[in-house]
């Protein structure tokens, strides 16, 4: 084989490799998703299914809705935002930071009052006034919609002011859960999805406040760019498989 033929083969192979690598990058994009802490377990399950089906890689960042919102308006490179409320996605859309008409309500959350102590068989709102309760964990209402819901419940039960010295505020609902789980707080207002976990039983007891005591926790998602992979992910989130997973983790569907 002469030198010219060898050169032509080398050029052809180079072109094939370039086309292959280019098509691979199109088919398997990376999607960066900011997710409210309460939705972490459900989101991991949804992501595993989506990655298998789509070939895309999803990078998850969990935290409080308020903190994620601040990061996004300051230029954090997220593609999709799954909030624990409808307010921040709405504001992002109004500000032009999020894609117009891309907001969806993906889940409706529920609040519970939880103790991890196994000896506590039954709890209800009366336990909030118990003198043995020294610490009550909540997510910070300034950052977390679940913290706002907890404040609303206590306000409507007329105990918000009397419990101020006992409150331990977590940056997000996951931290509020850890305060109770570790024993640093006897009680805590957390997300129902954190105790209704299909993967592992959570010890202790909980009380579900009537939803008349707090505003509905409608959790919305919004696109932060028009990447096809981002749109594919949001479309998957609305699909039957994702919705079944969401229900399995204790959420109501919109």
Predicted regions and their residues:
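Low-complexity, intrinsically disordered regions enriched in charged/polar residues
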Residues: 7-9, 25, 122
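Bacterial N-terminal signal peptides that target proteins for export
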Residues: 1-13
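Bacterial N-terminal signal peptides
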Residues: 10-22
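Polar low-complexity intrinsically disordered regions enriched in Ser/Thr and small residues
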Residues: 5, 23-25, 207
């Amino acid at each position: 084989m002469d030198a010219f033929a060898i050169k032509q083969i080398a050029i052809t192979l180079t072109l094939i490799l370039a086309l292959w690598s280019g098509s691979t990058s199109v088919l398997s994009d990376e999607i960066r998703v900011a997710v409210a802490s309460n939705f972490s377990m459900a989101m991991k399950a949804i992501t595993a299914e989506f990655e298998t089906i789509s070939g895309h890689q999803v990078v998850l960042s969990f935290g409080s809705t308020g903190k994620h919102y601040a990061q996004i308006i300051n230029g954090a490179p997220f593609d999709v935002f799954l909030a624990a409320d409808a307010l921040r996605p709405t504001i992002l859309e109004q500000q032009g930071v999020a894609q117009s008409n891309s907001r969806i309500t993906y889940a409706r959350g529920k609040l519970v009052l939880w103790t991890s102590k196994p000896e506590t068989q039954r709890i209800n709102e009366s336990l909030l006034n118990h003198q043995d309760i020294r610490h009550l964990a909540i997510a910070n209402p300034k950052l977390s919609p679940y913290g706002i819901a907890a404040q609303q419940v206590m306000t409507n039960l007329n105990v918000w002011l009397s419990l101020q010295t006992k409150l331990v505020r977590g940056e997000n609902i996951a931290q509020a859960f850890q305060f109770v789980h570790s024993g640093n707080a006897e009680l805590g207002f957390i997300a129902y999805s954190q105790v209704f976990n299909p993967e592992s039983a959570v010890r202790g007891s909980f009380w579900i406040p009537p939803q008349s005591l707090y505003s509905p926790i409608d959790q919305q998602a919004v696109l932060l760019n028009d990447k096809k992979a981002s749109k594919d992910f949001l479309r998957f989130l609305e699909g039957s498989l994702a919705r079944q997973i969401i229900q399995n983790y204790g959420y109501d569907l919109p």
